[in-house]
């Protein structure tokens, strides 16, 4: 039986990796082995950072809410506790947006939270 070489399969796989490596510097975009290493690392970073982005935005929102709440005389935890007791169902993304763009509206929320504590 004749030996078969993996010509088409290998060529297709290499082309796929080199296409993903387009725009990389030097051998990383021209040669398969460094391109493959770089692409695998890039895909790993992309997956990791998609998950980290969610955590980072939540941290940013909490920091903004905390700063605005402290300007109105409450800590973050007291403010969130007061909102929960008052039955206000706003997530942290919306609260942070209100804190940045509508100081008067945020002050009203703080007063509502203070009243329910």
Curated annotation (Swiss-Prot):
InterPro entries: Ribosomal_bL20, RIBOSOMAL_L20_CS, Ribosomal_protein_bL20_C. It comes from the Bacteria. Keywords: Ribonucleoprotein, Ribosomal protein, RNA-binding, rRNA-binding. GO terms for molecular function: rRNA binding; structural constituent of ribosome. One of its GO terms (biological process) is ribosomal large subunit assembly. One of its GO terms (cellular component) is ribonucleoprotein complex. Belongs to the bacterial ribosomal protein bL20 family. Binds directly to 23S ribosomal RNA and is necessary for the in vitro assembly process of the 50S ribosomal subunit. It is not involved in the protein synthesizing functions of that subunit. This is Large ribosomal subunit protein bL20. It comes from Symbiobacterium thermophilum (strain DSM 24528 / JCM 14929 / IAM 14863 / T). The lineage of its organism: Bacteria, Bacillati, Bacillota, Clostridia, Eubacteriales.
